[in-house]
From Swiss-Prot:
The protein's name: Acylphosphatase
Enzyme class: hydrolase
Domain Acylphosphatase-like, residue spans: 1-83
Active site: R12, N30
Lineage start: Bacteria, Bacillati, Cyanobacteriota, Cyanophyceae, Synechococcales
Pfam families named in the record: Acylphosphatase (PF00708)
InterPro entries for the chain: Acylphosphatase, Acylphosphatase-like_dom, Acylphosphatase-like_dom_sf, Acylphosphatase_CS
PANTHER family in UniProt: ACYLPHOSPHATASE (PTHR47268:SF4)
Record-stated family: Belongs to the acylphosphatase family.
């Protein structure tokens, strides 16, 4: 979960591009409470790089907190923006 000013700043689209560049699969979506949720699978180094990016976000974002959690692996081979 990503908290702060993370909606209406292009966070989902930018996260999608970054994940694809890193070869990560999963998804990103806005939540009704103003947070952004990301589910990502990939090599540990790529996941670390995506997390580091999420801690800053795109221009205009002000990330306050990134809360990671372990989820079951889905085996998906794409990354998408969910609505």
């Amino acid at each position: 979960m990503i908290e702060g000013r993370v909606q209406r700043v292009g966070f989902r689209a930018s996260c999608n591009r970054r994940a694809l560049d890193l070869g990560i699969s999963g998804w990103v979506r806005n939540l009704s409470d103003g947070r952004v949720e990301v589910q990502a699978e990939g090599p540990p180094l790529a996941l670390s790089e995506l997390r580091a990016w999420c801690e800053v976000g795109p221009p205009g974002a002000r990330v306050v907190r990134v809360t990671p959690s372990q989820l079951p692996i889905t085996g998906d081979d794409w990354f998408e923006v969910r609505y």
